[in-house]
C-alpha cells in the first residue's frame, strides 16, 4: 500500500538521520596506491558493492532487506572528508574513500564486519590499501582492536584508539 511504502521510506530516512545524531564513529580509509581514482570508477565500484547515494551526499550501505543503515562512505579530499557531488563525480578525481560506522548501532557486529569486508574488496579492486581512522595500515590485529571497540561501545563513551 501507499502507506506501507511511505513508512518504509520514513524508516530509511530515520536510520540515515542516525548519522546526524551519532555519538561517535569508527572510520576506515581506503587510498589507491598510485594515483587518484576517477569519479566514474568510484561510482561503479560503490554501486557494485551495494552502496546507494543518499542523505548528506554520502553513499550508504544497508542490510540485506534494505531497512537498516549499516555504514556510509564519504570521499577524502585535500582538505579532509566531503560528500559526493553527483553532478561532477564522473570528472572529479577521488583521492580516497572514508567508510564510517555511526555509534551506537543496533547491529554493530554485522555493520562493522560488512564495512570491513567491503572496504577490503574495494581496496583490492582499485589497487589500494585500507587504513584505520588514525591512518595506520589495517592489519588483522588492528581489525580485531577496532571490531572490539565497536562491539563494546556504550552510549556516552569516547572512542580511544
Language model segments and positions:
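Active-site-adjacent structural patch at catalytic or cofactor/ligand-binding sites
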Residues: 71-78, 84, 91-105
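Extended, low-complexity intrinsically disordered regions enriched in serine/proline/glycine/threonine
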Residues: 1-17, 21
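Ser/Thr-rich, low-complexity intrinsically disordered terminal regions
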Residues: 52-84
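Well-ordered alpha/beta subsegment
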Residues: 98-161
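Short, intrinsically disordered, mixed-charge
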Residues: 44-52, 78, 117-128
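Core, soluble structural subunits of large cytosolic macromolecular machines
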Residues: 14, 20-22, 26, 44, ...
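Extracytoplasmic beta-rich ectodomain segments of secreted or membrane-anchored proteins
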Residues: 19-61
Amino acid at each position: 500500500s501507499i502507506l506501507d511504502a511511505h513508512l518504509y521510506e520514513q524508516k530509511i530516512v530515520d536510520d540515515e538521520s542516525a548519522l546526524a545524531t551519532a555519538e561517535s564513529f569508527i572510520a576506515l580509509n581506503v587510498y589507491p596506491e598510485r594515483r587518484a581514482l576517477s569519479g566514474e570508477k568510484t561510482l561503479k565500484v560503490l554501486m557494485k558493492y551495494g552502496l546507494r547515494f543518499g542523505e548528506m551526499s554520502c553513499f550508504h550501505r544497508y542490510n540485506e532487506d534494505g531497512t537498516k543503515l549499516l555504514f556510509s562512505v564519504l570521499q577524502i579530499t585535500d582538505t579532509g572528508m566531503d560528500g559526493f557531488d553527483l553532478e561532477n563525480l564522473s570528472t572529479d578525481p577521488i583521492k580516497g574513500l572514508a567508510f564510517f560506522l555511526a555509534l551506537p548501532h543496533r547491529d554493530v557486529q554485522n555493520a562493522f564486519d560488512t564495512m570491513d569486508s567491503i572496504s577490503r574488496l574495494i581496496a583490492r579492486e582499485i589497487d589500494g590499501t585500507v587504513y584505520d581512522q588514525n591512518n595506520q595500515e589495517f592489519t588483522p590485529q588492528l581489525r580485531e582492536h577496532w571490531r572490539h571497540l565497536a562491539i563494546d561501545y556504550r552510549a556516552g563513551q569516547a572512542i580511544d584508539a
